Amino acid sequence: MATINELQDEVVEEFQDFTDWMDKYQMLIDLGNELAPLDEKYKNEQNLIDGCQSRVWLQCDYVDGKLVFTADSDALVVKGIIALLIRVLSGHTPTEIMDADLYFVEKIGLKDHLSPTRSNGLLAMIKQIRMYALAYKTKEAEA
């Protein structure tokens, strides 16, 4: 499996093909549409991310020492953003996720082109992913 940085570099390369931000938004929507559906049983208050204007559910499973994320949102652009985060971070260890510098967010211009509420939502999604990583890293240390 590719490293987090290799996956980030792939994302940056794909987004460099577009100079117009409308095309980048369309790519986010397409990525959201391609995101595997989240089982309805996971669309609950426990998996709802606080701090997002849209509703975003994030499910985390611990499989063979790695975190596997699935998610959904009721907003297409937000669904695309969480799809990017899942693509880069899912399948990695809690330590790798905790130590990751998510530079792709800035390199593709995401921070600069999101509304303040969507930027806050992006930060909330990253924070929730890192919280899962911290929780599982703590469980590993206790085992």
Q: Residue locations for each model-derived region?
A:
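Alpha-helical support elements that line or immediately flank enzyme active sites
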Residues: 82-92
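Glycine-rich phosphate/pyrophosphate-binding loops
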Residues: 91-108
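Hydrophobic (often cysteine-bearing) scaffold residues that line and stabilize catalytic clefts
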Residues: 78
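A short interface-forming secondary-structure element
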Residues: 73-75
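N-terminal intrinsically disordered, cationic/polar leader segments
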Residues: 4-55, 62-66, 105-142
